[in-house]
UniProtKB/Swiss-Prot annotation:
The gene is rsmH. It comes from Xylella fastidiosa (strain M12). This is Ribosomal RNA small subunit methyltransferase H. GO terms for cellular component: cytoplasm. The keyword Transcription regulation does not apply. Gene3D superfamilies: Putative methyltransferase TM0872, insert domain, Vaccinia Virus protein VP39. SUPFAM superfamilies: Putative methyltransferase TM0872, insert domain, S-adenosyl-L-methionine-dependent methyltransferases. InterPro entries: RsmH, SAM-dep_MeTrfase_MraW_recog, SAM-dependent_MTases_sf. It is an enzyme of class 2 (transferase).
């Protein structure tokens, strides 16, 4: 069965693919969006494909290496400037967060529900694994990451437990960490966990985001995408939690809306909008949620790059 990504139809509508255009899929994953773009491109069109995950790139090469319209590059979309010249793209798509294959394969170490090595790296050849990071850093740094990137209210309690645990034995497995977190979480008088989600959900999110520099890459990637889009080009971003969506929303607003001014201070320069918001944020409907429950937290935002000369007239 062909994988259909979250908010697929809305993403394709947002990109507004033209037959001879040039597009960038910055998060190839299983290739669902890439296939959708290629179905609409003619012989003169072009699709640039990127992904941090070498397994995703291997799939892209298996499926699309014989298609002359496709250029495949292993790496984060934060590096898209190395692949696309300024004002050369008609559309850019980022489908953020962890992919289904990464969650579903225990050996990748992303899931607290399946036992595997405590890795969490989207590119296993880059940087520290989650286990290496947890073994090295201070209690304070662990707590800060869980709080900042996982929005975990019990971050200090969990960090304290991790440091105490690692003093006696290493944390090397996903289920090992998940069970440790669950064992120290505050509970109600009846013994139930206070949260409706799994106790390790936010901690795993925070560690994963930190290990992969996800929010740093997102901020850099958005700026690079803006530079690479030609006037009229579309930016389409699908995010899966509030931290990602906040960055995307603020980025679009910063380049689309006149910033507030202080009437007591002189205006430094005239604001020139570079983006136009296209519609409101889009979420999955009930029909899609029945087929794909993981779509519940997805938010899609679309913006169009403006012609600077037109904008200042």
């Amino acid at each position: 069965m062909t994988h259909v990504p979250v908010l697929y139809t809305q993403a394709m509508e947002g990109l507004r693919v033209v037959e001879n255009g040039t597009y960038l899929d910055g998060t190839f994953g299983r290739g669902g969006h890439a296939r959708g773009v290629l179905q609409q491109l003619g012989p003169g069109g072009r699709l640039l494909v990127m992904d941090k995950d070498p397994e995703a790139i291997a799939m892209a090469e298996r499926v699309f290496s014989c298609d002359p319209r496709v250029v495949i590059r292993h790496g984060s979309f934060a590096l898209l400037a190395q692949l696309a010249a300024p004002q050369s793209l008609d559309g850019v798509l980022f489908d953020l967060g962890v992919s289904s294959p990464q969650l579903d394969v225990p050996e990748r170490g992303f899931s607290f529900a399946k036992d595997g090595p405590l890795d969490m790296r989207m590119d296993p050849e880059m940087g520290e694994s989650a286990a290496q990071w947890l073994a090295r850093v201070s209690e304070r740094e662990i707590a800060e990451v869980l709080w900042t990137y996982g929005e975990e209210k019990q971050s200090r309690r969990i960090a304290r437990a991790i440091v105490a645990y690692r003093a006696n034995q290493p944390l090397l497995r996903t289920v090992q960490l998940a069970e440790l977190i669950a064992s120290v979480m505050l509970r109600t008088k009846s013994g139930a966990c206070k949260s409706r989600i799994h106790p390790a959900t936010r901690s795993f999110q925070g560690i994963r985001i930190h290990v992969n520099r996800e929010l740093v890459d997102l901020e850099v990637g958005l700026e690079a995408a803006l530079a690479a889009l030609r006037p009229g080009g579309r930016l389409v971003v699908i995010s899966f939690h509030s931290l990602e969506d906040r960055i995307v929303k603020q980025f679009i607003s910063r380049h689309a809306k006149v910033p507030p001014t202080n009437r007591r201070l002189p205006e430094v320069q005239t604001f020139v909008p570079l983006l136009r918001m296209i519609g409101r944020a889009i979420k999955a409907d009930e029909d899609e949620l029945e087929v794909n429950p993981r779509a519940r937290s997805a938010v899609l935002r679309v913006a169009e790059k403006l012609d600077v000369l037109e904008a200042v007239r």
